[in-house]
UniProtKB/Swiss-Prot annotation:
Post-translational modifications: Exhibits temperature-dependent phosphorylation.
Gene Ontology terms describing biological process: regulation of transcription by RNA polymerase II
Ranges spanned by the short sequence motif Nuclear localization signal, renumbered to the chain: 346-348
Protein name as it appears in the record: Putative heat stress transcription factor B-4a
Source organism of this protein record: Oryza sativa subsp. japonica
Gene: HSFB4A
Length: 380
C-alpha cells in the first residue's frame, strides 16, 4: 500500500515537471505557422494518408515563405537561417526534391510533444579549449654546440654544456597535451603547435639527421656565398681587362718570324688598314675578338690573325707531297728562312746620325765652410 502511494506520488511529480517544461520559442512559432490553414498554399503539413498523424511539413514556395510569413513570426526573412535552426533542433530533410522536414516529436495535433525536442550541442563545445597543463616532469635536454633548433618563427641556439630551458620549450610540452577535435578547421589551427612538440620528442636517430641537415644547410649557404664572391671577382677582372689592358705589338724579330710563317700579314701599301678592318677592330672587344689590331703613333698597322684550321693545313700538306720542297703551314721552309733573314736585315739597319747638340749644364753640390749650397757649373 505504501509502495503504491510512493509510485503515485512519483507519477504526479513527473507530470508536474513535464507540465512545467516549456518548449523553445522557435519550435512554438514554427508549429503555429505550419498549423495555420490560411497559409497552406505556402507551407503545410504533409498528409500522405489524409489523417491527423502527419509527422512532416513542406515549404511549397520558399520565396513567398521568406518574404510574407517569416517576418510575422521572427525578426528576419532569411530562409537559409530558418533551415539552419531546424537542423540544430534535429529536423531532417526527407527528400532532396523539395523542402520537406520531419522530426519524430513534431506531429500534427500533438503540440505537447514539442517539449521533447532539444537543441543540439555543437561539437566544438565538447572539447575543452584549454586543458590544465601537465605537471612539469619533463627533464631539460642537452644540445650539441652550434646546433640550431627551430620553433615556429623563432630559433634556439645551443652552446656546449648549456641547457636550453626557456618558456618556449615548456610551451612545446604543454601544447602536446591539447586534444584534437574531429574538425578540419581545428586541426589546421593546431598543426603549427603540434609540429614542434613532435620534433621535441624525436628519437636519437632523428636528432642526428636533423643535425646533419643543419650542417649541410650551413655548408650550402657558405658555398653559395663563395660562389657569388667569385662571380663578382670574375666580372671585375673582365671589366678591367676590357677597359684598361691594351695589346702590345710584337718585336721586329718576332714580327718577321710570324710574317714568314704566314701568321702575321703585312699592312697595305698606303699604311692604312681597310675600313672594314678598322670598323671591326673598334667594334669588338680587345680580348674577345678573333683578330687583334694594334694602332701606334707610326703609320704602321699590324694585324694578328689566328692560324688556319687543321683541315686546311692537312689539305695543303697532302697537296704538297708531289713537290720537291717541304711546306709548313703552307709556306716553303727555304723561302721562310730567306724572308726571315731579309726581314731581320731590314730591321737591323743603323739609324740616321743626328747632329750633336750642345751639352746641358749640370747641377753639382759644393760644400764650403760646413755649409751646403747649390751652384750651376758648366762643363769644361
Amino acid at each position: 500500500m505504501e509502495w503504491e502511494e510512493e509510485s503515485e506520488a512519483a507519477r504526479q511529480k513527473a507530470a508536474a515537471a513535464s507540465a512545467s517544461v516549456v518548449p523553445a520559442p522557435f519550435l512554438t512559432k514554427t508549429y503555429q505557422l505550419v498549423d495555420d490553414p490560411a497559409t497552406d498554399h505556402v507551407v503545410s503539413w504533409e498528409d500522405d494518408d489524409g489523417g491527423e498523424s502527419a509527422s512532416s511539413f513542406v515549404v511549397w514556395r520558399p520565396p513567398e515563405f521568406a518574404r510574407d510569413i517569416l517576418p510575422n513570426y521572427f525578426k528576419h526573412s532569411n530562409f537559409s537561417s530558418f533551415v539552419r535552426q531546424l537542423n540544430t533542433y534535429g529536423f531532417r530533410k526527407v527528400v532532396p526534391e523539395r523542402w520537406e522536414f520531419a522530426n519524430e516529436f513534431f506531429r500534427k495535433g500533438e503540440k505537447q510533444l514539442l517539449c521533447e525536442i532539444h537543441r543540439r550541442k555543437s561539437a566544438a563545445a565538447t572539447w575543452p579549449p584549454f586543458p590544465p597543463p601537465p605537471p612539469p616532469f619533463f627533464a631539460p635536454r642537452h644540445f650539441a654546440a652550434g646546433a640550431f633548433f627551430r620553433h615556429g618563427d623563432g630559433m634556439l641556439h645551443g652552446r656546449l654544456g648549456a641547457l636550453v630551458t626557456t618558456t618556449e620549450r615548456r610551451h612545446w610540452f604543454e601544447s602536446a597535451a591539447l586534444p584534437v577535435a574531429p574538425s578540419s578547421r581545428l586541426l589546421s589551427q593546431l598543426g603549427p603547435v603540434i609540429a614542434p612538440a613532435r620534433r621535441a620528442a624525436a628519437t636519437p636517430e632523428e636528432e642526428a639527421l636533423m643535425q646533419e641537415n643543419h650542417r649541410l644547410l650551413r655548408g650550402n649557404a657558405a658555398l653559395v656565398q663563395e660562389l657569388a664572391h667569385m662571380r663578382k671577382l670574375y666580372s671585375d677582372i673582365i671589366y678591367f681587362v676590357q677597359n684598361h689592358v691594351r695589346p702590345v705589338a710584337p718585336s721586329p724579330a718576332a714580327a718577321a718570324a710570324l710574317h714568314g710563317l704566314g701568321v702575321l700579314r703585312p699592312p697595305p701599301a698606303g699604311g692604312k688598314a681597310p675600313a672594314s678592318e678598322v670598323r671591326g677592330a673598334s667594334g669588338r672587344s680587345a680580348t674577345s675578338s678573333s683578330s687583334l689590331t694594334v694602332a701606334e703613333d707610326q703609320p704602321t698597322l699590324l694585324a694578328l690573325r689566328l692560324p688556319r684550321t687543321t683541315e686546311k693545313i692537312i689539305n695543303e700538306v697532302s697537296g704538297g707531297n708531289g713537290g720537291g720542297s717541304t711546306k709548313l703551314f703552307g709556306v716553303h721552309l727555304s723561302s721562310a728562312d730567306e724572308q726571315t733573314s731579309s726581314g731581320a736585315s731590314r730591321k737591323r739597319s743603323p739609324p740616321q746620325e743626328q747632329p750633336p747638340t750642345s751639352p746641358a749644364p749640370k747641377r753639382t753640390l759644393v760644400v764650403e765652410h760646413s755649409e751646403l749650397r747649390l751652384s750651376i757649373v758648366s762643363p769644361p
